[in-house]
Amino acid sequence: VSKFLFAVFLIFLSCQIKAIEVIDLYQYKILVSDKTRQSRLTASRDALFKVLIKVSGRIIDKSSPAFRKAIRNIPAYMLKYEYSDGANNQQFLVIKFEANKVNQLLESVGQPIWGNRRPLVALWLAVEDELQRELVTQDSFPQIEQLLSDKSTRRGLPLVIPLLDLEDRQIVSVTDVWANFSEPVNLASQRYNAERIVTARLYVNINNNTWQLDWRFSDESQFAVNELVGDKQQIVGQMIDDVADKLSIEYAVKALNFNNDGLFNITIVGINNFTKLELVKRRLLSLSVIDAVTLKVVKDNKFYMQLKLSGNELDLSKALHLDSAFIRLFDPLASEKENPKNEYRWVGLK
């Protein structure tokens, strides 16, 4: 069983499944020095800032009037809170915020909402230390692995570090990762059902004796490398920030004003009873890009629905692509005119 670095409900049970459902997006656990009211208020304000980052995938401007107003009335955003004990007599405050109010605050500061179904990222990280190169696992580099785990959790980024067991090592080597050879890396990543794959290398640059980290998505150009320089732990954490930033730009939905009131028509097949119809409607409404679902017509076992979107058609397409419960009906050999327009089959959750 592979070891996942993020507390999630795994909703992929077949090769068709592209994403996982992230839990506790609107919850944050933060270290506190005591249980006084002032400590709770200070920690709650910091936690709200971190939750805004998790939900949107973007860094929020703390100086914005909307955010400053929100932290002055922080109890209004809190759904519940509780204290928990940690190691070495540490105390943590666990706060759950009200989702609707967080979403409204993001809209008011001009930031998008990244839904709770997010692409799983497989990270292959090679480290060169004293001329020895090795891939990161929990056993080989436990501190780096823990840092990746903590950082990805804070950013709401589902992340898996490959096991590097015999099956992996028969397909991919540290040289493949170091040299950004996509083919073996992508092949080895198939067992993890990752939607996106990142290869990275961490080493000391001999020219300035400083740690450097080069990373890229495996589906990008060989030359599309992102370079980070600085403290080793800092740049490893920065890589996770950068990956989350780039994916949020690709997948997050920003509220837009539509001339047509944001209405979009879609056809669903594969519904044969009322229970399935309700499941379909609830599933669609769970997508952050969809505000409302209206059933318009049922004809020839096809359910014609009208969606009210908070994003655009591309946002909807990306959200449905990530959702395993829907499969787009599309014939790559047919002409554009012959293909059904905006038609999906409901396959449900396996």
PLM ranges: what are they?
Residues S2-V8:
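Sec-dependent signal peptide recognition
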Residues I74-Y83, V160-L163, D176-T210, L320-D323, ...:
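A short, hydrophobic beta-strand-centered structural micro-motif
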Residues R45-A66, P119, L123-W178, V280-S310, ...:
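N-terminal segment of the mature soluble domain
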Residues K62-A126, E134-D139, Q143:
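Signal peptide-directed extracytoplasmic domains
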Residues T42-G57, V94-F97, L106-I113, T153-P158, ...:
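C-terminal/domain-edge helix-coil "capping" segments
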Residues L31-K35, K96-V102, A126-E130, L164, ...:
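Solvent-exposed coil/turn segments that connect beta secondary-structure elements
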Residues S14-Q16:
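N-terminal signal peptide c-region/cleavage motif recognized by signal peptidases
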Residues V22-S33, S189-G237, N342-L349:
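Amphipathic beta-strand/beta-sheet edge segments enriched in Tyr/Trp
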